[in-house]
């Protein structure tokens, strides 16, 4: 289920304080042909995004600060970079059914527990990597 031999590998940045959550998604993404970068905090995620120039970012909403994931999306949008940012959240985070994602620079939300197949399908569709 690789992205394709002739296509450039798309890079995904995973930002989550939970190393198990990152490892689970990383393994699934790499098995599907994506290159993966990781960060454990919002601040580290922002630095890593500037360093590796990912094609998309998956970030937990709630990390070391109240809204670390939303802050990453907002700051990247302020720089003018057009990187799809997807939140990984629980229904308790209050994002389900919320509106205004586009204004925050958020491309979508994946609910925990995350189904890697849905994430991969969404990323391949969005990034033209299918």
Label every PLM stretch briefly.
Residues 19-37, 104:
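Two-component/phosphorelay signaling modules centered on CheY-like receiver
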Residues 1-11, 115-130:
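Non-catalytic signal-transmission and effector/linker regions of two-component phosphorelay proteins
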Residues 38-56, 78:
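Acidic, metal-coordinating helix/loop segments flanking the phosphotransfer/catalytic sites
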Residues 67-71, 78, 91-110, 117-122:
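Alpha4 helix (beta4-alpha4-beta5 surface) of REC/receiver domains from two-component response regulators
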Residues 16-17, 112:
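Acidic di-acidic motifs
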Residues 60-61:
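Active-site residues of response regulator receiver
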Residues 27-31, 48, 100, 122:
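Alpha-helical interaction/dimerization surfaces of two-component signaling modules
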Residues 19, 40-44, 67, 117:
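Acidic phosphotransfer microenvironment of two-component signaling modules
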């Amino acid at each position: 289920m690789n992205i394709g031999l002739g296509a450039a590998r798309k890079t995904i940045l995973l930002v989550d304080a939970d190393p198990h959550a990152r490892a689970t998604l990383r393994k699934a993404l790499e098995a599907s042909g994506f290159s993966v970068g990781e960060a454990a905090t919002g601040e580290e995620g922002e630095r890593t995004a500037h360093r590796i120039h990912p094609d998309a970012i998956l970030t937990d909403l709630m990390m070391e600060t109240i809204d670390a994931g939303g802050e990453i999306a907002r700051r990247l949008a302020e720089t003018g970079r057009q990187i799809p940012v997807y939140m990984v959240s629980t229904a308790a985070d209050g994002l389900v059914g919320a509106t205004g994602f586009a204004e925050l620079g958020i491309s979508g939300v994946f609910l925990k527990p995350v189904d890697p197949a849905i994430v991969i399908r969404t990323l391949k569709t969005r990034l033209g990597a299918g």
